[in-house]
Amino acid sequence: MEKVKKETALYAFVTDDGVAHRVWRIADRERVAALETLFEKVPATYIADGHHRAASAVKVGLRRREAHPDYDGTEEFNYFLSVLFPDKELKIMDYNRVVKDLYGMDPEDFMFSIEEDYQVFHLTQPISPKVKGEICMYLGGEWFLLRARAELLSARSIDPVKALDVSLLQDTILGPLLGIGDPRTDQRIEFVGGIRGLRELEKRVSQHTYAHAMDGSLEELGPAVAFAMHPTGITELLDVADHQLLMPPKSTWFEPKLRSGIFIHEIER
């Protein structure tokens, strides 16, 4: 690989978000064969991002196999495009949530309900959660630290999916208090990659709380709320996969991210 990287790149560019992309094509058959041999020695690969897209691709492939019972396994529908990274070269960032309203609750009742499962601390400035089991919340122009009660974390720790902080938030706040049953389809929730920062959460909450009236004044729509998450750990992700379970939607934000559309996998019969 180091020899190939000394050659002229097929593509070399910087995207609008400042991420540099360099692509080399390996066409030499001996090099390709050597890489295939090395990959055969890799004991396991894990889907770190795009779990639900991968599952959809598998379903499409299986349906095409049913439609073409004479398939031999070399057809393009037997494959889907992916990129592999060593786990040491991946960084998982927080994947945060913004909910556009409090589901008919006033802020005081909402805070009171949260205290059943969390210790709540007022913050003087925006910060990200430092440890697992903590969630930072932005509500009413103020930041709060939510620390899950020890007995709650202990009860959930035996299940690798329930032990995830994103599952904790969904099961204790988003679902029962804010009425977010399916975060994949509910239009009241937004997901914000941690690379955007905490100020982006404040901005979005403000956008959903206030609107410009016809006379130019600000009209209050109602309280919105944001949740800043502690990043999912690599070991947590691997543990879920090793138990043959599926990661919840929007549970990981990975860097680096390849620019979509650089490579296209065409599926033909």
Show the residue positions of the predicted features.
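Surface-exposed, charge/polar-rich loops and edge strands
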Residues: 1-210, 218-269
